[in-house]
């Protein structure tokens, strides 16, 4: 790692994040996270891990999958690849194989963003490199998705991962990633740094399902660099309880006619604190962005739904939409849409609405034989089941199945 990068990380070791609750990292740092045995196929991971994988859309049988990466705590335990048009491997392997890869590290996400990015870099320098490297070859169009899972199996572990995803020119890549904890884990911290690089004409769809334990803290840090005529589509689903999560991925549309879509489905339960959002910087002529979120708060949960669209050059378009349902007097949704225009001839809009379930809808469903609880549950599931755009038909159907499974507890 470059000396300048390490110096920046050292200075930011205690730097608080701009948003979200501050976390004492010393609570989670264990001298040695348990080592986990590598296996050649996903179906050979421990049964307790397999059961959780299915809940987050990761198939242990690897049916219709182009490849698989599974990390348990800090150990990459399974890597497979069934396609010649893509590469997938642990970051430690990739850095040994490709000397040029270091030039991509900490370019889309600044190492001194906060204590979480800094700690990830410092652990990397000490040899604790987690995360995966994915690359699609120029001109390739992989039909089947890659799947990746970050799994926490030990108590009080701080899991760090640094992922780099590169879509070469005119390539298309689909990724399903699931993050989860074991049934015996009550307290842990996950920090995932992800850097995406989309070259000219490339497309990435990235579908993520989170299924954490109630006392787990989560701090993803994501940056996306989008080149000329490239498209990045993110689908995010979280409907299970978690202690707190704070995520604010930022996409930089530097290329002409580049396009970004963020679609998020959030279900706050128990005393979860969800501080979620996305930011798109439109810097290339003809670039565009769409950010859509659906949020439901129950029990004593708190949801902060943020969105920031910045138009920096003429001829860009963007729309930001946040809709929320508050289902209990002890819960809260705080919508924060921001539009920033610093050029002429741009077109940006936002729509935000927070409310409750309409009584007439409940009355109609109860008149058809449902109880009030059944009626409310049906309305919530319908509200959260928004159409996922931009996916191939087979992957869209699978994503809908993953969403339906996630919504069973709502």
Swiss-Prot record:
Biological process terms in GO annotation: iron-sulfur cluster assembly
Annotated signal sequence range: none
Coiled coil feature spans: none
InterPro entries per record: Fe-S_cluster_assembly_SufBD (IPR055346), SUF_FeS_clus_asmbl_SufBD_core (IPR000825), SUF_FeS_clus_asmbl_SufBD_sf (IPR037284)
Family (UniProt): Belongs to the iron-sulfur cluster assembly SufBD family.
Protein name: Iron-sulfur cluster assembly SufBD family protein MTH1150 homolog
Organism, as annotated: Methanothermobacter thermautotrophicus (strain Winter)
């Amino acid at each position: 790692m470059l000396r300048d990068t390490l110096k920046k990380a050292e200075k930011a070791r205690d730097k608080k994040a701009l948003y979200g609750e501050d976390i004492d990292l010393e609570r989670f740092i264990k001298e040695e996270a348990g080592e986990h045995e590598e296996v050649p196929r996903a179906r050979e991971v421990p049964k307790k891990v397999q059961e959780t994988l299915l809940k987050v859309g990761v198939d242990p049988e690897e049916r219709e999958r182009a490849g698989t990466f599974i990390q348990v705590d800090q150990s990459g335990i399974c890597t497979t690849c069934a396609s010649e048009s893509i590469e997938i491997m642990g970051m430690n392997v990739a850095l040994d194989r490709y000397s040029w890869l270091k030039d991509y590290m900490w370019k889309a996400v600044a190492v001194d963003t906060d204590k979480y990015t800094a700690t990830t870099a410092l652990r990397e320098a000490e040899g604790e490199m987690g995360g995966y490297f994915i690359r699609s070859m120029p001109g390739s169009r992989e039909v089947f998705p890659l799947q990746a899972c970050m799994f926490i199996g030990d108590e009080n572990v701080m899991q760090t991962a640094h992922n780099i995803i590169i879509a070469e020119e005119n390539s298309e890549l689909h990724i399903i990633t699931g993050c989860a904890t074991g049934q015996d884990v009550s307290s842990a911290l996950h920090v995932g740094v992800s850097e995406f690089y989309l070259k000219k004409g490339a497309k990435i769809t990235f579908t993520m399902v989170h299924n954490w334990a109630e006392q787990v803290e989560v701090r993803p840090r994501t940056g996306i660099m989008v080149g000329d005529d490239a498209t990045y589509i993110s689908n995010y689903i979280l409907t299970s309880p978690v202690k707190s999560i704070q995520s604010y991925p930022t996409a930089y549309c530097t290329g002409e006619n580049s396009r970004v879509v963020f679609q998020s489905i959030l279900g706050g339960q128990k005393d979860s604190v969800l501080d979620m959002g996305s930011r798109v910087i439109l810097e290339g002529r003809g670039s565009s962005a769409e950010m859509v979120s659906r949020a439901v708060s129950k029990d004593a949960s708190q949801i902060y739904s943020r969105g920031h669209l910045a138009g920096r050059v003429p001829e860009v378009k963007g729309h930001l939409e946040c809709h929320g349902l508050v289902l209990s007097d002890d819960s809260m949704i705080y919508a924060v849409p921001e539009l920033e225009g610093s050029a002429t001839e741009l077109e940006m809009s936002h729509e935000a609405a927070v409310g409750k379930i309409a009584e007439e809808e409940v009355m109609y469903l109860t008149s058809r034989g449902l109880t009030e609880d059944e009626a409310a549950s049906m309305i919530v599931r319908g509200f959260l089941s928004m159409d996922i755009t931009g996916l191939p038909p087979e992957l869209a159907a699978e994503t809908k199945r993953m969403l339906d499974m996630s919504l069973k507890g709502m």
